Design a protein with these regions (language model features):
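Membrane-interface helix-boundary motifs at transmembrane edges
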Residues: 30-39, 113-125, 197-208, 267-275, ...
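Soluble non-transmembrane domains of integral membrane proteins
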Residues: 518-610
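Interfacial and helix-entry/exit segments of alpha-helical transmembrane bundles
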Residues: 39-48, 128-129, 203-225, 270-287, ...
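Extended, hydrophobic alpha-helical segments in both membrane/secreted and soluble proteins
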Residues: 175, 182-192, 204-262, 275, ...
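Transmembrane-helix bundle segments that line or gate the permeation/cavity pathway
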Residues: 50-73, 77-79, 86-111, 139-149, ...
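Contiguous transmembrane helix-bundle modules in multi-pass membrane proteins
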Residues: 1-34, 50-52, 66, 244-254, ...
């Protein structure tokens, strides 16, 4: 009976989302205040009904109700309770329910926190989010229902959650990523609502920007956590594969980054209006594209859900309706959008325009590199491969001028400026950059490569000019220590995010150029050397868990003869799913990671091991956290506080 309650809640959600999609928009069109006033209670009703469905699915997993097919496929009596509950979103049906529940969360947040906005604007925004909800609730209810019964027969035990997903990082990675994906629906809804009314002004940008920042922060955290999981869980030391599904999360991140910067121009100068609206449509459209790639069945990926063609066709049709309808409205109304003025050749606006051009170039590279092999294969033209070297080289070319813009842009004034005002600090910074670009790789790693030099240069120029801009802004009217305390959260957020980019670039440059990998065969007492580090194999002991059996290898590491760390790498065999998994062991720090992965046992009682030395790799994720923190500070800037908006 409990599973049926989930079905009833989904059916109720469909009815409420249909009403939300119709009545508020009709009321806004006809100027009917009573119909517009229904938007908020209907949104809260949708959230309540989907919360009931979500809670029911949690309960079914908690009690291992094997009369439900989705529970059978993803749970087992031996599975620990925390993995049992996270299995709710461990496969296709449950992750779709998570998606639409988070959409209801975002919709409710808009309803709750936008009481200062005009009633018509709120009605249109919530109505558009209702339309989005209708499509996804229909999809879940009729093609991907997690409450489908196994009657008349049901097993006494389940098949178990995929062992790759039995990890703490994967408990939080999908919700964070989906919060980012779904969050861009708010920016999309604001953009479409503004297109419908033709009211595209600085107020619209100010309303949209904190919601866009929130979505971008969640997406950043989701990508960072997913990358970290891939690094320590998959056992080969990589952190980004340029996998099509990884790329499908990176593309909306690039579009969202461009949107945040474009919104700042629209808000402050009234420029880039049409372009900003297009970016809002693009960001959410790319989120939907990612959903299609994961669930269409056309991908073979660690991230892809097994799915039948019917589901893929439904998502494709939904994609065409949403994106096609949005672009048709944009084509019809876009010509009516008028920006206040054009940017001068040398101004903050022109810097941000170049920023957007480079971000869109990067997006096109990822888009074409991801989809061309898929399209080529689907057309029956055979298989082609576009691998990591292509993406790495293209991003090196794009990121070099982007880093220079990231440093110079904040120093340039709005509307009009002269380069002579910042010539001296820029020339000095470039001089230091050129020296440091060669010196840092040489002194830190005794080796120089082209990409490590360029990476070091990018890091140095961003950091130096960010610190100079901080000093200039703080001492504009007062002493440094007085002025720095008066800087806005938005300014601190911008600086932290830019420094985060510098840190990530530094981590990528050094880890990719100077990592050392050794595949070794070791018996107890054997040692292997990587640079100044000695890895000594101390043996393997049994390491059994609640749903797996395995072995744990001890590797003692010393540096220049002095003990450094003891690592314990595991090899697990999951008895239900009959899958083997590697659990790497890592000792890390700011300057290097030492990484050990245990392989198979060989004939002569020796073991295969993979050893890594990875310099500065943690800077990649630390930089990502800095970016997210920067976005968070910008989101909570005083001018985005809702009482401030009300006064304005």
């Amino acid at each position: 009976m409990i599973a049926e309650l989930g079905n009833y809640a989904l059916a109720l959600s469909l009815a409420v989302s249909l009403m939300l999609a119709i009545f508020p928009l009709w009321g806004a069109e006809k100027g009917n205040a009573q119909l517009m006033a229904l938007a908020r209670p209907m949104t809260y009703g949708l959230f309540a009904s989907l919360s009931i469905a979500f809670a029911v699915l949690f309960y079914l997993f908690a009690v291992n109700d094997f009369s439900v097919q989705y529970v059978v496929n993803n749970s087992n009596t031996a599975l620990p309770i925390y993995y049992r509950l996270s299995a709710v979103w461990g496969s296709h049906e449950g992750s779709l329910l998570l998606w639409i529940w988070l959409l209801a969360v975002w919709s409710s947040a808009v309803a709750l926190l936008s009481k200062h906005l005009p009633q018509e604007a709120v009605a249109r925004v919530l109505g558009i989010m209702g339309i989005i909800s209708v499509g996804f609730v229909l999809f879940v209810l009729f093609t991907s229902n997690p409450f489908t019964r196994t009657f008349p027969d049901f097993p006494v035990d389940g098949k178990e959650l995929n062992p790759m997903l039995q990890d703490v990082g994967l408990i939080f990675h999908p919700p964070l990523l989906y919060m980012g994906y779904v969050g861009f629906s708010v920016a999309f809804a604001f953009a479409i609502a503004s297109l419908m009314t033709g009211k595209l002004d600085s107020a619209w940008a100010r309303w949209s920007r904190p919601w866009t920042l929130a979505a971008w922060v969640f997406l950043t955290l989701g990508i960072v956590l997913g990358s970290w999981w891939a690094y320590y869980e998959l056992g080969w030391g990589g952190w980004w594969f340029w996998d099509p599904v990884e790329n499908s999360s990176f593309m909306p991140w690039l579009a969202g980054t461009a949107l945040i910067h474009s919104l700042s121009v629209t808000e402050k100068r009234g420029s880039f209006k049409a372009w900003t609206v297009l970016l809002a449509i693009l960001a959410f459209s790319l989120c939907l594209l990612g959903t299609f790639l994961v669930r269409s069945g056309i991908l073979v990926s660690v991230h892809a859900f097994a799915s039948d063609p019917t589901r893929g066709l439904y998502i494709l049709a939904y994609l065409v309706v949403v994106i096609g309808g949005s672009l048709a409205l944009y084509a019809y109304k876009g010509s009516q959008i008028r920006s206040r003025d054009n940017a001068e050749r040398y101004s903050r606006e022109s810097m941000l325009l170049l920023n957007n051009i480079l971000l869109m170039t990067a997006l096109c590279v990822v888009f074409l590199g991801t989809l061309l092999p898929l399209v080529h294969k689907q057309l029956g033209l055979g298989s082609i491969s576009i691998g990591a070297p292509f993406f790495d080289q293209m991003f090196l070319i794009i990121m070099t001028p982007f880093a220079l813009l990231l440093g110079i842009g904040p120093l340039v004034k709005w509307r009009r400026d002269q380069f002579s005002a910042i010539r001296t600090p820029v020339v000095i910074s470039v001089f230091v950059m050129l020296i440091a670009g060669f010196a840092l790789p040489y002194f830190l790693q005794d080796k120089i490569t082209v990409s490590s030099v360029l990476g070091s240069m990018m890091t140095v120029i961003i950091a130096l000019l960010a610190l100079y801009e901080l000093q200039q802004r703080a001492t504009h009217r007062e002493s440094f220590f007085v002025g720095v305390r008066k800087l806005s959260r938005s300014h601190w957020g911008m600086m932290l995010a830019h420094l985060g980019v510098a840190m990530t670039v530094w981590g990528i440059a050094f880890s990719q150029n100077f990592s050392v990998e050794r595949d070794v065969r070791m018996k107890v007492g054997d040692s292997a050397q990587i640079g100044r580090y000695d890895f000594k194999f101390a043996g393997v002991t049994d390491a059994n868990g609640p749903n797996y059996i395995g072995g744990k290898a001890q590797i003692d590491i010393s540096k220049d003869g002095q003990p450094e760390a003891s690592l314990f790498a595991e090899k697990r065999f999951y008895t239900v799913s009959r899958m083997s998994m590697t659990e790497a062991a890592i000792t890390g720090g700011l300057t290097r990671d030492l990484y050990v992965a245990l392989g198979e046992k060989l004939e002569d009682n020796s073991w295969a091991l993979r050893l890594y030395y990875k310099p500065f790799i943690r800077w990649i994720w630390i930089g990502g956290l800095f970016m997210a923190l920067g976005g968070l500070l910008c989101m909570f800037d005083r001018r985005y506080r809702f009482n401030a908006l009300l006064k304005k």
